[in-house]
């Protein structure tokens, strides 16, 4: 039996080498599942050939990296990036922002899966909880969508202001209280989590939270309006979907204004902007940015 030796809280532990576990980690780094299992089997054969009884995690990572490099250097680099993020000691709070329809939900799910983060929540869910606690009479904008919040404005916006954005900001200001509470709780409990949704707007979350080394924010955009509009057709065609297509199309003009505003805020606050055209490219961009940002900010935070 081959044992893998690692460390947790400074204490060594050993566990049996598993092709399945290794294959899963390779898949999360972007490798095809079949190829991942074949490589895991190849690594096992190599360890047996070398008569290894005990192999440290660092040694195993090096072996895997070298074998990956022989086959595909890009996958090898992705694997190392994934390992660096996984080895980060602090909980990772990942915020995926963007207007309705740009794909924050699907990207958040895929990124969470890639990084092995089990906790994920949408800002829509946070808003729904807050709606149960705060009446429509008290804060009417909370009981509207992001793109219809302007309808609830008690005082009409001045002509020089965009009423859609005035309503949106009012709506986001309230939901941000709940978002910050989730972030604070995750930091306190040491829980990694992915939060996604249109209520995540650069400049609204307190700087003391957003500037933490282990909190990362990304803004997704879809520059082409036709492509953005087409996303709603695919989003609403599922039988389980409860969101009417007509409603999104009716207010698409407002959604685009919010889309551009979030992008503008991202540029203003130096938040990474990713054009979400291709899912794989978007995920790779997020993972690469995370390693460059988190790893280089504080190398002392890593195990080893």
UniProtKB/Swiss-Prot annotation:
InterPro entries: 2PKG, ATP-cone_dom, P-loop_NTPase. It catalyses: (2R)-2-phosphoglycerate + ATP = (2R)-2,3-bisphosphoglycerate + ADP + H(+). Keywords: ATP-binding, Kinase, Nucleotide-binding, Transferase. Disulfide bonds: none annotated. Pathway: Thermoadapter biosynthesis; cyclic 2,3-diphosphoglycerate biosynthesis; cyclic 2,3-diphosphoglycerate from 2-phospho-D-glycerate: step 1/2. SUPFAM superfamilies: P-loop containing nucleoside triphosphate hydrolases. Its cofactor is a divalent metal cation. It holds the Pfam family ATP-cone. Its EC number is 2.7.2.16. It comes from the Archaea. Catalyzes the phosphorylation of 2-phosphoglycerate to 2,3-diphosphoglycerate. Involved in the biosynthesis of cyclic 2,3-bisphosphoglycerate, a thermoprotectant. PANTHER family: P-LOOP NTPASE DOMAIN-CONTAINING PROTEIN LPA1 HOMOLOG 1. HAMAP family: 2PGK. Belongs to the 2-phosphoglycerate kinase family. This is 2-phosphoglycerate kinase. The lineage of its organism: Archaea, Methanobacteriati, Methanobacteriota, Methanomada group, Methanobacteria.
